[in-house]
Amino acid sequence: MRILQVCKKSPTPQKDGESIAIHQMTRALQTQGHQVDVLAMLTAKHPEKDEKMQWAGVQYSYVKVEAEVSVAGSLKSVFTPIPYIVERFVNDIFSSTLVDKLEGVKYDLILLEGVFLGVYFDVCRKHSKAKIVIRAHNIEHFIWRRHMAELPKGLKQWYLKHIMVPQFEIYEKELIKKIDGLIAISPVDLAFFAKETECPMISIPVAANLKQGGVEKTSAKFAVGFLGALDWQPNFLGLRWFLDEVWSKFAVEKDVVFQVAGRNFPEEIYTWSFGQVELMGEIEDAEDFILNQQIIVVPVFSGSGMRVKVIEAMSMGKCVLSTSVGAEGIEVHNGEDILLADSPEHWLGLLEDLWLNQEKLKAIGDKAKENMYSTYSPDALAGRLQSFILAL
């Protein structure tokens, strides 16, 4: 098949879960014998591309798209059916580039990476006879509804409750009724979509990177790590919760360190006052960061889809401590290959137990790695993907 993969960010460099998922999808399609072209946006938030990391044999095209959020744009969306956070990706140059590709190549399949690209559905349908499939990285209106519940009463909460969340819910439900197929990243998301449309659909998670292996940490300190972009509200709010409610109590009189890494640190974070915390900012090597931790924490309370960092850490044989939401959609076994907790008291108790019984870290990490290798093998997932698209 000749396949066009349309993305709202470059798949390289792989600095977040979405770019990793896109990059993996390109490779999975390629390994099944398909010829893949990638058309991606370069936005103000994600302006980079790393040509050295691109897959050989894949044609990559990029278009600069502003896509920045503004108050004026948010207010204007009150009078439009499309949520502003989606509408901001509409761009004439990107649209014309897409049309040129569709009219220049006879594609068999168009893969839109995320519901945000649904604004180009009509363009794809008009200029191509290819099957159109959306890969839903999340249920977006679920994320925003959960985020809304975390906010204090005010203008932002009112806007989300009365404008954006209802708009987004209608937009997502109407979009998936038009497409030819849907790929969800988690079975939880798939169950929602299955209630809304009868189009062919499947759940295919992000694969584990099986080339990686855990290495013993040599530092004398008990290291706990957090990895995530802090311009994403669930990460930011979850990190603050962990520091306030858990770390400030756990770290007292212990030789421990909490290392925080990720993109787009807000200035506010540098005003926080917590002991035994290292703010590392954006890092070059996420794998090395994970391998240097004894525990990876995922304290998020909103969002949907799948946390790629959980898959990565577990595949490296690391002990992951997460909220239930943080591990949602991933086949895990609480107490065996991961530790799940949702209250400060439970989190604190688990950390104290691991601090006193560090042999548990290796046992849980070993089980985690075993689970990732058996459940999230790239070859097995690529085979499922192949069966799905050939049946469309």
Residue ranges and their predicted role:
Residues 203-291:
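Conserved catalytic-core segment of nucleotide-activated headgroup transferases in glycan assembly
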Residues 162-213:
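Donor nucleotide-sugar binding/catalytic pocket of nucleotide-sugar-dependent glycosyltransferases
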Residues 309-312, 319-323:
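Short hydrophobic beta-strand element within catalytic cores of glycosyltransferases
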Residues 334, 338-345, 353-358:
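Conserved acidic donor-binding segment of nucleotide-sugar-dependent glycosyltransferases
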Residues 1-61, 103-105, 249:
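N-terminal subdomain of nucleotide-sugar transferases
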Residues 72-84, 133-170, 229:
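Acceptor-binding helix/loop patch of EC 2.4 sugar-transfer enzymes
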Residues 180, 291-305, 316-319:
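Acidic donor-binding loop of glycosyltransferase active sites
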Residues 360-375, 381-386:
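A short, well-ordered alpha-helix in the C-terminal region of glycosyltransferases
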